[in-house]
Curated annotation (Swiss-Prot):
Name of the protein in its database record: Methionyl-tRNA formyltransferase
CDD domains per UniProt: FMT_core_Met-tRNA-FMT_N (cd08646), Met_tRNA_FMT_C (cd08704)
Region (Disordered): 279-302
Entry keywords, A to Z: Protein biosynthesis, Transferase
Functional summary from the UniProt entry: Attaches a formyl group to the free amino group of methionyl-tRNA(fMet). The formyl group appears to play a dual role in the initiator identity of N-formylmethionyl-tRNA by promoting its recognition by IF2 and preventing the misappropriation of this tRNA by the elongation apparatus.
Organism of origin: Cereibacter sphaeroides (strain ATCC 17023 / DSM 158 / JCM 6121 / CCUG 31486 / LMG 2827 / NBRC 12203 / NCIMB 8253 / ATH 2.4.1.) (Rhodobacter sphaeroides)
Amino acid sequence: MRLIFMGSPDFSVPVLEALHAHHEVVCVYCQPPRPAGRGKKDRPTPVQTRAEELGLPVRHPTSLRTPEAQAEFAALGAEAAVVVAYGLILPQPILDAPERGCLNIHASLLPRWRGAAPIHRAILAGDEETGICIMQMEAGLDTGPVLMCEKTHIGPEETVQDLHDRLSDMGARLILGALGALDDLVPCPQPDAGVTYAEKIAKAEAGIDWTRPATEIDRQIRGLSPFPGAWTLLNGERVKLLRCRLAEGHGAPGAVLGGLTIACGTGAVEITLAQREGKRPMEPEEFLRGFPLPEGSRAHTS
């Protein structure tokens, strides 16, 4: 099938690779290069980098609302566009241009977690399952009818990074199935009940309040890893907590009970991956060799 691909971050790359292997990708649309790193040099998106490696033409317009951009898009003569974490709203002339419209790969069980950060929000909310929906796009935010859906369990120690990688691969597999069966798929309108929105993650959500229950802090750590990274102060230094598990233990909120097990409002969490500022992430044994925490030390955020 003759396709346009639209995506930008790492999550989109396996989908691009799958489409390139099985279909004709006539053009790749992604976000433009932006300043990044210490030198603030323009850095292309992961999708642009991979597309160029594959020898695919790349476009990164800052808007798709101009008549010129819309004419260029339509002139590609694509049968369909596949959209996954692109980063721009598609106006109606873009949605209407491909013969079979635009298909979106969304990382949630719609209508739950429409919006920008469905993987983070599913873990933060304590959801036991999530999945991938292939959706026929329309003008609303993730409101289109669902063509195909697959569920997956969220593991008790899974982080955003873990789930991100699994769902990315699932999306690549599912879109191939959807494209192959497109003539037979029946669009299923999303129900009005159960709609929730996955707002972008704010850095202000990352500071840990140790008076909260261990179950909530566990979700916060896993649901913000690796970015922006839940953090606390230990011995006056900000430390990111990137992996954890629920643990036995009781004590004053924030008290270090031994190793990297920290008491919460109720229960405790055992930190299994932590990162000091300017250092790489470390498991507890290595972390504590260079940063000893005597029993009775306190974690806090202010």
